[in-house]
Design a protein with these regions (language model features):
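Helix-loop-helix "hinge/cap" segment bordering the ligand-binding cleft or interdomain interface
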Residues: 75, 132-134, 149-217, 226-265, ...
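Extracytoplasmic "Venus flytrap"/periplasmic binding protein-like
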Residues: 68, 72-143, 147, 172-178, ...
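Extracytoplasmic/periplasmic substrate-binding proteins
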Residues: 56, 116, 217-221, 248-349
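N-terminal secretory signal peptides
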Residues: 1-21, 29-34
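Hinge/lid segment of periplasmic solute-binding proteins
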Residues: 113-166, 188-191, 199, 218, ...
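Conserved C-terminal helix/tail region of periplasmic/extracytoplasmic solute-binding proteins
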Residues: 175, 390-391, 400-464
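Short, well-ordered beta-strand elements
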Residues: 47-58, 80-85, 108
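C-terminal lobe and pocket-closing loops
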Residues: 287-301, 314-428
Length: 464
């Protein structure tokens, strides 16, 4: 290519960057020039841009929806190959850690809000403001956006879909007990009635997951419901506060109503226990509907049997708190520039209404739309599963509207900015504290101090 051709190409690139030349005109002119210059040469196949994207939705229906969206994207972008892979969060966490250690991250992935804080501080991800603005910042629930917009004014991720944890109870276990869950407001109300719902070994009044990741969920939610937090205003552990001590005492009082071996149960075991009638209540999500359809008798697969019960507050709390599942897409800074640009193009395509609806409909009561308008759209609300489980849908929407659905370990909104929140979440320290008290009878104040000291010594101390 001669100097004249080089100057012309540079001018095209400059005009494209300045926005004076549209994408289509830029590509058309560039292609025409390339054709003239390359005419005498033998044609070669264009190398595709391979984009690796990991998400946390391995559900077969969701994989089918993602596959269809990717195929439609490929029809429009023949120079890009999207390699989409779904896996559970535990597998994702391990795979991401290995990829980071090897300095070979994917182009983009789902992650947790607390991981965004950590990755942002370490320079591992980059902002996605252009994606948020392209799909319509003003169209998205503010309570979805708030957790990923940082003090620098930038969005460091975009939530793929959301859900809020709800307290589920078996309505068919209430007759003859005198229990009215809708009257519950406090932990004392709950503790008063749990004995009436406990019929071992047939079923237990409550089931909880004892795996550390899920124990962390209950720690920060119950801390928040008792007016406290895992952290103080300076980001230091607040585990010796009266609110946390009270939360641990509450957990001890729940133990008689939990099934044997609960401390080794994972989240899926608790859902199946509720669906099969082995537990009267559970902390659950919208995807639990699938377990009900799989395990419960046909005549019980409805919200009259599988009810929404209110979450309660501790003696120092003012409002209950629930977990917000808002795993965001993030773009990794070390990925090649062309891959990052292609990943952003795919995300813009993914969030187009006709594509995004297919994705959300794959798990209709759990993968909830980030767009406000969908919750006023009859075609969205009248999906058969959303109609069947309308009380579940309404309960989740209410949590978002009142602003009491927070991401993992975020009892207070400012907690999301704590640099080591991800390291605390990844450690077993909080779960060890709970098990020491609930399973081994350790004094809550002693266990809380030991956990606090570990966080200061092993996490905060090493972060400085």
């Amino acid at each position: 290519m001669g100097r004249r051709d080089t100057a012309g190409l540079q001018r095209l690139v400059t005009e494209r960057k300045e926005g004076t030349l549209g994408r289509r005109e830029f590509l058309t002119t560039l292609a025409a020039g390339a054709a003239v210059v390359a005419a005498p040469r033998r044609a070669t196949a264009q190398k595709k841009i391979a984009v690796t994207m990991w998400d946390t939705e391995p559900n077969p229906a969701t994989r089918a929806a993602v596959k269809a969206i990717v195929e439609d994207f490929h029809k429009l972008h023949k120079d890009i190959e999207i390699r989409a892979e779904g896996m559970g969060w535990g597998d994702m966490d391990r795979k991401l850690q290995a990829a980071m250690a090897a300095k070979s991250p994917p182009t983009a992935s789902h992650t947790q809000s607390y991981v965004v804080t950590s990755f942002r501080a370490k320079g591992l991800i980059e902002p996605v403001d252009d994606v948020v603005k392209a799909i319509g910042e003003d169209k998205i629930f503010p309570s979805v956006l708030r957790w990923l917009k940082y003090p620098d004014g930038k969005y460091w991720g975009i939530t793929h879909a959301w859900g809020a944890e709800i307290f589920g109870g078996r309505g068919d276990y209430l007759p003859g007990t005198g229990v009215n869950p809708q009257s519950w407001r406090t932990w004392d109300d709950l503790l008063r009635d749990l004995p009436k719902l406990n019929k071992p070994p047939q079923y237990y009044a409550l089931t909880l997951a004892g795996i550390p990741f899920f124990v962390n969920e209950d720690v920060y939610m119950w801390a928040g419901a008792n007016g406290g937090s895992v952290f103080d205003a300076k980001g230091q552990p607040a585990l010796e506060s009266p609110q946390i001590i009270g939360m641990l005492e509450f957990w001890k009082k729940l133990k008689p109503f939990l099934p044997p071996g609960w401390s080794s149960h994972d989240y899926l075991e608790t859902l199946s226990a509720w669906a099969t009638g082995k537990a009267a209540s559970v902390l659950m999500w919208g995807r639990t509907a699938g377990y009900i359809d799989q395990y419960a008798p046909p005549d019980k697969r409805n919200p009259d049997v599988f009810q929404v019960w209110p979450k309660t507050i501790g003696p120092m709390g003012k409002a209950p708190l629930t977990q917000f599942d808002n795993e965001p897409w993030v773009i990794y800074a070390d990925a090649p520039a062309d891959e990052k640009a292609a990943a952003k193009e795919f995300l813009k395509f993914f969030f187009k209404p006709e594509n995004y609806r297919r994705y959300c409909d794959s798990v209709p009561v759990h993968l909830l739309s980030i767009f406000k308008a969908d919750f006023k759209d009859s075609s969205y609300l009248n999906h058969a599963e959303r109609k069947r489980w309308k009380p579940w849908l309404d309960a989740q929407l209410k949590w978002v509207e009142i602003g009491r659905a927070h991401p993992l370990l975020v009892s207070n909104p400012e907690d999301v900015l704590i640099p080591w929140i991800g390291d605390v979440a990844a450690s077993p320290i909080l779960a060890d504290m709970v098990m020491a008290v609930v399973e081994r009878g350790r004094d809550p104040k002693v266990a809380a101090k030991e956990a606090s000291d570990k966080i200061v010594r092993d996490i905060i101390g090493k972060a400085k």
